[in-house]
Curated annotation (Swiss-Prot):
GO terms for molecular function: imidazoleglycerol-phosphate dehydratase activity. This is Imidazoleglycerol-phosphate dehydratase. GO terms for cellular component: cytoplasm. PANTHER family: IMIDAZOLEGLYCEROL-PHOSPHATE DEHYDRATASE (PTHR23133:SF2), IMIDAZOLEGLYCEROL-PHOSPHATE DEHYDRATASE HIS7 (PTHR23133).
Amino acid sequence: MTAESTRKASIERSTKETSIAVSVDLDGVGKFDITTGVGFFDHMLEQLSRHSLIDMRVMAKGDLHIDDHHTVEDTGIALGQAVAKALGERRGIVRYASLDLAMDDTLTGAAVDVSGRAFLVWNVNFTTAKIGTFDTELVREFFQAFAMNAGITLHINNHYGANNHHIAESTFKAVARVLRAALETDPRQKDAIPSTKGSLKG
């Protein structure tokens, strides 16, 4: 993580179901150290870090003998909380971003407003219940938890795609790229809060 950055935060979250430690640097270079015990999910979080340029450390232990649900959802909660904490008052950020991201057969769009208001719009359909052993419905569960706890409005729309792995991965990459753009410091407004209300606390 960069020595100059002040937009860093760490969160530790423990329940009877999971124990999770997350650290982020919003002004990083996309370095990651991620272990959740869920291989496909680790791969997706690595994409989120690498393409957002947010340095991430995620260590999660959960009740995987039951299923992956609690680990994935609670990681989304902790990661969202860490991003919100690192943002602070959200001064000087670009705030908005949107794009369409292509991945082979798949095209997925993402749009974000780092507004302090939590909302998820999800228009993504998978044609299989699992990718390997990973439940595809957990992709939405992660982004729901992340958006609610980061305090962001997030829209994700898969336009088309035949390969379910590509559909899932394109959602993480698309979200990563809009986060990269929206969380950047805007040199034209520096420490100003990008809102006529004077606050981005929801």
